[in-house]
Amino acid sequence: MRILVAMSGGVDSSVVAGLLKSQGHDVIGVTMKLWEGPNGEMPETGCCTAADSEDARKVAAKLDIPYYVLDYTASFSENVIDNFVDMYSQGLTPNPCVECNRSVKFDHFIDQAKKLNCEKVATGHYAKIVRSNDSLELHKADYLEKDQSYVLHMLTADKLPKIDFPLGTISKPEVRQIAASLGLKTAFKKDSQDICFVGKKDYRNFVSSRIDFSSSGDIVDKDDNIIGTHEGVHEFTVGQRKGIPGGQGQPKYVTKIDVENNKVFIGSKADLTTKNFIIEDVSFVNGEEYENLSIQTRYNSHDIPCKLHKGKSESALQRRSFSTKKERSLLARKESSFYSGKERFFPIKKSAHFFKKRALF
């Protein structure tokens, strides 16, 4: 089988290419150029750097497979960077990696695979695609410590047959051992933790450089008493504790961001919790609505048991209500994933614009 391998220059995608080649597949390596400096150069820090591209090229040469770097900077800028800035300007917390998977990577990789006569696209994500009866489901990886199903929740049923996750049953230590046995230079390369277009810089400076947040505003408590000032709502996210004025020795958190009135509300941790929530833009991958679920609101966080209340969606936003047994703090994040069953298989794709953390009743 001819397979396009999405190569990031890291150990995971390197091993995917190596494993598929050793299994007799016709492998083609492709790296996306997503972000560039003012002179068209690839960034030096973060992920998707010039060094990463060079590492991917050397791995491809070691494995003796064709390798290409394709330029998708325009698509990335429009769909990911603009979205990143827009979300912060609305007082919401974006997830650029999820947005990149949704709007850029998988669509373009699948399209490129078709052009190269490849039957599948393989990536180094830790997740599994499992057949159940006549449909495919997205499951968590066996190695839960690195499970990445959360950042893949946007994958729709029509895309799953075109994708392969060879690392779904392999642990990270095993991946590094395989890389070393294949003589790949990425065997002990550290995983990137940075936002590719921000790197090690403060995201606030990046956002403020792209939109005018020059007007200062007030930091207030839940009774609207002024307790401080801020230089722009983009510097805050709901649930944030660092840099928040305290009081009476108790930590304070951002509980609400009022963009229209340029106010940042702060309160106690208890002010962030509720049992009832509204979620928007819910779609069910296999068309079946599950009731007893668990929800994950950020990468590598614990699942929270919840109940999805069935009923007709409100308007075109596909709005649904759900609740938890105990009061929880589910913040105003852009992305969340639902899971169902003992194996935590992935019945629902959520591409929500935001959580609305408010009581339903």
Explain the meaning of each model-derived region.
Residues 1-153, 180, 254, 344, ...:
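ATP-dependent adenylation/nucleotidyltransferase module used to activate substrates
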Residues 122-130, 134-349, 353-355, 360:
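AMP-forming adenylation/ATP pyrophosphatase catalytic core
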